[in-house]
Amino acid sequence: METVLKSLFFLLVATSFTLAKERKPQTLSRGWGDNLEWVQTYEEGLFKAKSENKPLLLINHRNDCPHSQALKKAFAEHQGIQKLAEEFILLNVVYDPTDKNLQLDGQYVPKVVFVDPSLVVRADLPGKYSNHQYTYEPADIDHLFENMKKALVLLKTEL
């Protein structure tokens, strides 16, 4: 009887492991690019941008915002962006950074801002919209890709 109970127990344990959903561990990418290296804080991003002479790409978003989620999906699926992003210090935040330089044209999400290694916020790399200049829709993903390229060119020509 004891052998039968042990066998039944091990069968139940094995079945539960087999049926359990495989979950990816939560990373700093929050789904924006799991194969990319992301920093945890704005301060860390600024430090690494300056010390590694790379621009900081800051994405301000919300987990409960459908526009943020749609942009995240487009960003993560765009192979060119994922490759080019390796040339940046990457940070995505779900809170509003307190740096007044990042406010630019107000508080909204999603907002994508570039900061160069001299710690200057690049207000000259906006999205397509006049009311929320630093927001992008999934349809604007190629415009974001072009702005990423411009940020790297500015790095080489201005700094």
Swiss-Prot record:
Top-rank taxon, per record: Eukaryota
Pfam family, one: Thioredoxin_7
Keyword list, A-Z: Endoplasmic reticulum, Secreted, Signal
Residues that span the membrane, as ranges: none
Database matches in Gene3D superfamilies: Glutaredoxin
Keyword Hydrolase: no
Motif extent (Homodimer stabilization): 29-38, 44-51
InterPro entries: AGR/TXD (IPR051099), Thioredoxin-like_sf (IPR036249)
Single GO term (MF): dystroglycan binding
Primary localization class, coarse: secreted
Keyword Iron: no
Gene Ontology BP annotations: positive regulation of cell-substrate adhesion
Name of the protein: Anterior gradient protein 2-A
Gene: agr2-a
